[in-house]
UniProtKB/Swiss-Prot annotation:
This is ATP-dependent RNA helicase DDX55. InterPro entries: DEAD/DEAH_box_helicase_dom, Helicase_ATP-bd, Helicase_C-like, P-loop_NTPase, RNA-helicase_DEAD-box_CS, RNA_helicase_DEAD_Q_motif, SPB4-like_CTE. It catalyses: ATP + H2O = ADP + phosphate + H(+). Residues 40-223 form the Helicase ATP-binding domain. Belongs to the DEAD box helicase family. DDX55/SPB4 subfamily. Residues 514-538 have a biased composition (Basic residues). Its main location: nucleus. Residues 485-513 have a biased composition (Basic and acidic residues). Its EC number is 3.6.4.13. Residues 254-402 form the Helicase C-terminal domain. It comes from Gallus gallus. Probable ATP-binding RNA helicase. Has ATPase activity and is involved in the maturation of precursor large subunit rRNAs. The Q motif is unique to and characteristic of the DEAD box family of RNA helicases and controls ATP binding and hydrolysis. The C-terminal region is required for DDX55 nuclear import and association with pre-ribosomal complexes.
Amino acid sequence: MEAVTEGGWSSLPVALSPGVLRALQDLGFDRMTPVQSATIPLFMSNKDVAAEAVTGSGKTLAFVIPILEILLRREEKLKKMQVGAIIITPTRELAIQIDEVLTHFTKHFPKFSQILLIGGRNPMEDVEKFKEHGGNIIVATPGRLEDLFRRKADGLDLASCVKSLDVLVLDEADRLLDMGFESSLNAILAFLPKQRRTGLFSATQTQEVENLVRAGLRNPVRISVKEKGVAATNTQKTPTRLENYYMICKADEKFNQLVHFLRQHKQEKHLVFFSTCACVEYYGKALESLIKQVKIMCIHGKMKHKRNKIFTEFRRLAGGILVCTDVMARGIDIPEVHWVLQYDPPSSASAFVHRCGRTARIGNAGSALVFLLPMEESYINFLSINQKCPMQEMQPQRNVLDLLPKLKSMALADRAVFEKGMKAFVSYIQAYAKHECNLIFRIKDLDFASLAKGFALLKMPKMPELRGKCFPDFTPVTVNTDSIPFKDKNREKQRQKQLEQQRKEREESEGKKKFIKNKSWSKQKAKREKKRKLTAKRKREEGSDMEDEDMEELLNDTRLLKRLKKGKISEEEFEKRLTGSQSKFKEAAAD
């Protein structure tokens, strides 16, 4: 189903309840988007739906409204511990956002309780909250929801609570599968009743999503909503009001261009995407030092407990910069983002579209800019063909301030900056090697010297990808980097302790080697004789037919060794007698 109409909420073939209409009015949504007008009537008429629509098209309301209407039409009112609807989404940030939207509606329906179940906090708190307040509508991430289904010993039998389930929604289904949640989803589906309505919402259609549709939906109506306008015939996958730009510049110029751009747009709100968590940590700290009077925040997937707080705070800001990885690339609705800046291209073409889609949402205008190296220019044609994503070139600014020496000075002054830079460089190269478009993003074509300059490295790190390579265009600093201290006194104190411990261990190790090397000849000889004696004894016990003369020689050597140990003979005499004894026995054996 592709032909859909837009219009006011009253134009729907099914009437919405007064409370829902009041909530829509409070939110300022006077008209429907195409995905909403296509999905809501079908979902409300008890159909399973599989909806594909471009990012930023208003999919959240397309399932929140039907959920409320279906629960309002229930013949039997839901009890506190009964779950009527579950919304599963891939990230905490998206779950928080959906929960906030839902709150705008449920405040008009006090009889419905809702609960947010996400990682990054104590699961027992979720259990206690559910037991106290209930959860008629659950918004959850897959990992936490699966965990709570299995926690029967904590006084909550969630499997019993979901027997009353009417609606299941899988939001950003393609991302759920991309992030490896397939086994969790299958485990969750096994707990849910078969008689339910299911909605699957996605920005892209993949074979994995198709498999999930077959497994979780019954005779679904498929909805595919495309953008209007000239590009619609080519199924453009980015919003039509999004202006997409690209800039070609060398690796050692890219950071200066980024800072210049951000300084020129200080009053606006930006997302800056990097390829790895380590790059976010490093460049985020650099931007904090170089761009004043602007709120700069960092967020990435390895932040387990801070992410929720940072995301919520940034959403409330009128302006600022959020430095992030692709954890922020999907479904997240941050109000009034003016620019999405992709410092590093993402690992896949579909992720490029989702990053851009963080701006120009629900009919608003927005802009996106991706920085590319000269060797990556063919990526533009690839995006045009693969993702139907039209782009315009933005020329690099001339005579921008060179900030890399300042970044180097920061690394020389603080070991934390130096180490972050090294980790960021290594992680970038490792991520580059795994890029989906490896015909364009080829690691062998990278200018490592220019790249190291762009990271303001003090020296090249040791890593397999650089083994055997020479970098005449890169000059490492003459400073011994081991002497660079941490600015944090506690960290530096701890580092000095570790260095001292390592020094002692090294000295002990060298001392042992020296001791073994300088051990007296007699002790070494004694050790060999002891070993020889044990070998002879073992052979004797095994029934060896050793000659009597050999045994006599061994016993004689042993007697001499005992006399040497007691000091009755000197080492010189011991050596003389030992040699003479062996010669005598050899002569006897020859006769």
